[in-house]
């Protein structure tokens, strides 16, 4: 059974590569986003992962920066099931065979860490994308954790929403056993684990629910990017605690939506 699911994943990856190579050059933004969402839903379904949206789900189609805690390489596809976004990733990912090219074709913005000039370039690109109506998703911790804590947020990229005059949307991610609701570390891409090792852990685990909790949009304050980063982290920490059952959910209508129904199955 595990071998068949791995084969299905390989075929699904090939389908994604062909879609990007053959169709994407001829498609508009809306149709590309439909394909990205559909492909991501199918990937998660093969992995045995369902999606649950919790809290006041933000209005789609408006430019903003989404900030979230980072647990797994699955995070990107989980977020795509809600709304396809532009992600900021380290430049090394671009050199990964096949996957790097796939990320580039789906709009990932790559940054060379440690190069100040490149950080300025990426800030400019993020600002432009948001002003054009795109959601840009960043993981300000700069690394992955097992989900038990939220590391301090780096502040550099927070300059982009300040410059654009657009909001920051705090989001918390949590993976749990679909049957018991208990937190699972199977998807955690941490320490010396490789991508294939985490994939094996996911495929061997019981069905998983990926929870996405949304907070209220944050506006830039007079304190600048450092204050905005700290405020965003506080919001994400509060959301994580809510997911763990230690605090009430944020105001708004809660929603529990399976991945298969988060979007229409027909491109607009």
Regions found by a protein language model. Name each.
Residues 1-52, 101-106, 205:
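A transmembrane-helix-recognition feature enriched in membrane-embedded lipid enzymes
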Residues 98-100, 148-223, 227, 231, ...:
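A cross-family acyltransferase "interaction/gating" segment
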Residues 110-112, 215-221, 233-235, 268:
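Polar-ligand-bearing catalytic/cofactor-coordination segments
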Residues 226, 231-268:
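Cytosolic-facing loops and C-terminal tails of multi-pass membrane proteins
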